[in-house]
């Protein structure tokens, strides 16, 4: 059976995957084009505007151009163009999240996202009320792991803007394909850009990516991180250090016992919690060193 990639992207009311609402969902299916190496056929593509069931902050509207009737006038003034306005006729994402999850899993599909491991996938699973039973490639994590060692495309068409954030989808797309793209933060545009970026990674002469390697890398911590989400990082002496909030910069072994209990009661990644539980027992992670 040929490889089937399913790209997914959401535009939302905020940045917290545990609570934000979905205002646009896009899904694109690519299938390997027969015996042609590196060739893919787009078989399905759909983008749906969704009613998040909550007010849409102006700051979010400025990113994706979607608002509700209550915020329409402010959005017009801020955007200087007509926004997409959500009405009561638009369905809540939860109405079809389960169906979408099943469609991704069909025919052994591989979910492809950009920072989906930390954002889009938790949102989908929260609304579908179950976990993904299939495979997932997070192109963001691949880019972070390999862009420093790989050789970028020699010429980025249109020039490389100095303001381009190196971890953004736009930067990853430019790095691997040599092209900029218009319309970022439209979910359908972003999905296609993500798939193009992944396809270029697979064909890159020095990066060494295969689909199986990409699947493995999606489940591993990024370079320098102790845990999957990067809440803990290695310092120059090989000690684990907490990275966020008021305790940022404090060694794991020096964190207050009450703070460790707080982490375990909050919505942190299971990998992070496993390390914290070990720390409560006086067991701290040790950085592996490469023999010289």
What do the PLM-derived regions correspond to, one by one?
Residues 1-134, 152-185:
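Conserved non-catalytic scaffold segment of RNase H-like nuclease domains
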Residues 132-148:
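Conserved beta-strand -> loop -> alpha-helix junction used to position metal-binding or nucleic-acid-contacting
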Residues 186-199:
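Acidic, divalent-metal-coordinating active-site segment for phosphoryl/phosphodiester hydrolysis
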Residues 197-292:
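Acidic two-metal-ion nuclease catalytic site recognized across multiple nuclease folds
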Residues 128-129, 147-151, 177, 196-206:
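Hydrophobic/aromatic-lined pockets within catalytic cores
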């Amino acid at each position: 059976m040929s490889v089937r990639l399913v790209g997914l992207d959401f535009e939302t009311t905020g940045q917290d995957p545990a609570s934000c609402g979905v205002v646009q969902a896009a899904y694109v299916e690519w299938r390997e084009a027969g015996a042609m190496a590196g060739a893919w056929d787009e078989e399905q593509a759909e983008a749906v505007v969704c009613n998040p069931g909550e007010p849409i902050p102006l700051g979010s509207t400025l990113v994706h151009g979607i608002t509700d009737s209550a915020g329409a006038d402010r959005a017009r003034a801020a955007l200087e163009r007509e926004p997409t306005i959500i009405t009561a006729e638009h369905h809540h994402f939860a109405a079809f999240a389960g169906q979408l999850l099943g469609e991704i899993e069909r025919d052994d599909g591989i979910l492809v996202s950009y920072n989906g491991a930390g954002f889009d996938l938790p949102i989908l699973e929260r609304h579908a009320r179950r976990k993904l039973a299939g495979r997932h490639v997070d192109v963001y994590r691949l880019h972070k792991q390999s862009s420093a060692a790989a050789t970028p495309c020699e010429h980025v068409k249109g020039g490389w803007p100095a303001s381009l954030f190196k971890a953004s989808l736009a930067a990853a797309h430019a790095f691997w394909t040599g092209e900029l793209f218009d319309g970022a933060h439209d979910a359908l545009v972003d999905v296609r850009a993500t798939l193009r970026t992944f396809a270029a990674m697979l064909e890159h002469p020095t990066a060494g990516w295969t689909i199986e390697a990409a699947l493995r890398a999606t489940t591993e911590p990024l370079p320098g991180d102790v845990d999957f989400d990067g809440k803990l990082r290695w310092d120059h002496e090989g000690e684990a250090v907490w990275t966020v909030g008021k305790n940022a910069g404090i060694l794991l072994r020096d964190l207050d016992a009450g703070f460790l209990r707080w982490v375990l009661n909050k919505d942190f990644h299971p990998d992070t919690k496993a390390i914290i539980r070990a720390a409560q027992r006086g067991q701290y992670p040790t950085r592996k060193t490469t023999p010289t």
